[in-house]
């Protein structure tokens, strides 16, 4: 090797190795301090892209799990309201069974009907006012879509139905109206003409009605013959009309009434079945959301583990790398000092 002064190749070599060890030490310290093997794309470009996609999926699935929990909360809120509707219907049914007993006076029936009316009003209030996060869950038929995945189209629907007295077929429910049974013979009593403006014409002759039930004949708005059973309440003077079919012998063959009057218990059973159907649907969707949440959590765990293997730093490896780089730094600094002294030997030739 030539003895030169202008270029110290040994020093340059030592500096280059010292820079390499310095870079390795910096990388090891960065990874140990951040806990990440990939701190920028230069560390692992492909790994960084894969890890970023995992991050998007993990965050989306985590939010989807929260969405499913919100769906459970909505279903629970709705079912709680339906439970109150069910309780009111059960009490109305009990009162209706009580009203079917022939020992009840008109006053008793009126008291029973008053309570039934209040309970039906409460059902309407529940329908109108039950709210979850601004959504009226029982005020209309609607479908709520819950996002339960990280991608488009990954949804679950909650079908909600309007539940009020009208939808349950009970908006005209009345236990105070008594109708004649088919085959019963009705006294003609005082003659009353009932035409298309039935109410006003009948009111004028209320005092002439015989006690109990009286057969009323007249014509409807189309000019056809029509028959009604008029029942007078002696206490109040009120008259209730029930449309009827009458045979030639004067016997009632059928008395047409509202469903809530003709078959009140069947009407209530149908209403209860309607509420039970919606409650069953809500219970099923809650179980479905539970399954969705379990699956989402499992997927998030697996994706997180996969992301960790790509992105997270292995501390055992990085500590070893840091120790190695630290030793090389110390050795490189010492060697560089020796290399810088090598040019001093050239000066001895000038002495």
UniProtKB/Swiss-Prot annotation:
Keywords: Bacterial flagellum, Secreted. Its main location: secreted. It is found in: Secreted; Bacterial flagellum. One of its GO terms (cellular component) is extracellular region. GO terms for molecular function: structural molecule activity. SUPFAM superfamilies: Phase 1 flagellin. The keyword Acyltransferase does not apply. Flagellin is the subunit protein which polymerizes to form the filaments of bacterial flagella. Belongs to the bacterial flagellin family. This is Flagellin. The gene is fliC.
């Amino acid at each position: 090797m030539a003895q030169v002064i202008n270029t110290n190749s040994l020093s340059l070599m030592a500096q280059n190795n010292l820079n390499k060890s310095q870079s390795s030490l910096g990388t090891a310290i960065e990874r140990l301090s951040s806990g990440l093997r990939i701190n920028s794309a230069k560390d692992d470009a492909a790994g960084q892209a894969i890890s970023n996609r995992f991050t998007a999926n993990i965050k989306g699935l985590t939010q989807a799990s929260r969405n499913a929990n919100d769906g459970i909360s909505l279903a629970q809120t709705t079912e709680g309201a339906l439970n109150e509707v069910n309780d009111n219907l059960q009490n109305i049914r009990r009162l209706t069974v009580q009203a079917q007993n022939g020992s009840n006076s008109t006053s008793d029936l009126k008291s029973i009907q008053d309570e039934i009316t209040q309970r039906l009003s409460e059902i309407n209030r529940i329908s109108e006012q039950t709210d979850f996060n601004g959504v009226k869950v029982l005020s209309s038929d609607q479908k709520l879509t819950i996002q339960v995945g990280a991608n488009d189209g990954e949804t679950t629907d909650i079908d909600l139905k309007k539940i009020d007295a009208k939808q349950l077929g009970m908006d005209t429910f009345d236990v105070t109206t008594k109708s004649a049974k088919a085959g019963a013979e009705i006294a003609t009593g005082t003659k009353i003409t009932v035409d298309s403006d039935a109410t006003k014409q009948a009111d004028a002759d209320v005092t002439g009605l015989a006690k109990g039930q009286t057969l009323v004949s007249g014509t409807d708005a189309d000019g056809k013959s029509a028959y009604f059973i008029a029942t007078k309440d002696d206490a109040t003077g009120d008259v209730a009309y029930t449309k009827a079919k009458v045979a030639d012998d004067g016997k009632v063959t059928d008395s047409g009434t509202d469903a809530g009057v003709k078959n009140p218990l069947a009407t209530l059973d149908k209403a209860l079945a309607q509420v039970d159907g919606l409650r069953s649907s809500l219970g099923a969707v809650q179980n479905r959301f539970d399954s969705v949440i379990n699956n989402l959590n499992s997927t998030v765990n697996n994706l997180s583990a996969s992301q960790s293997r790509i992105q997270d730093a292995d501390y055992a490896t990085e500590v070893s790398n840091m120790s190695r780089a630290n030793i090389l730094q110390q050795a490189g600094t010492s060697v560089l000092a020796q290399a810088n002294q090598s040019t001093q030997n050239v000066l001895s030739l000038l002495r």
